[in-house]
Amino acid sequence: MTKILIVATSNAGKLREMQAYLANTDWELTLKPTELEVEETGDTFASNACLKASEVAKATGNWAIADDSGLQVDALNGLPGVYSARYGKTDGERISRLLKELGSEVNRQAQFVCVVAIASPDGAIALQAEGICRGEILHAPLGSGGFGYDPIFYVPEKQLTFAEMTPELKKSVSHRGKAFAALLPKMAAMLSSSAE
């Protein structure tokens, strides 16, 4: 039986990635109503993901899934962090600001973090998972795929930026991919226990 899962985002890129991660499940993903805005007031990725999932679930009366993710740059004391999406108006502005702030800094170590949360229709958080991908910030963008900071986030083990990776490769190594890999077994267990 297919269950509706409201995705607490208006970001079409995130929706497509989530649909790919959950393709072989009994969940049908749909975007949240555009007029439903949830302000990200949390100071951690986990608190923001839980807040968004809970608010959207309560407002729609459906199960809801949310993620909060961002880039933490070691030399910038973890910034942009939870402010990653608000570091500029466009992807280009965000990348430019980050590269300007890093300047000629030698330590380019960084990590992408993703926390995914699922809330039941009453707003209670049913599941939560985290994924982390370590990498480095390049001095200039490379690649045309992906979105956000993907063109400047380089994964040394793969010798590619996120923007140079195929969707399949990115899915297997990214912070979001790792979070969903941790979440899927929990979702399957939850569905089987609720079916009993």
Curated annotation (Swiss-Prot):
Query: One Pfam match, by short name?
Result: Ham1p_like
Q: Where is the active site?
A: 68 (proton acceptor)
Q: Which UniProt keywords apply?
A: Hydrolase, Magnesium, Metal-binding, Nucleotide metabolism, Nucleotide-binding
What InterPro entries does UniProt report for this protein, alphabetically? dITP/XTP_pyrophosphatase, ITPase-like_fam, RdgB/HAM1
The GO annotation for biological process reads: nucleotide metabolic process; purine nucleoside triphosphate catabolic process
Subunit structure of this chain's protein: Homodimer.
HAMAP family (UniProt xref): Non_canon_purine_NTPase
Q: Supply the name of the protein.
A: dITP/XTP pyrophosphatase
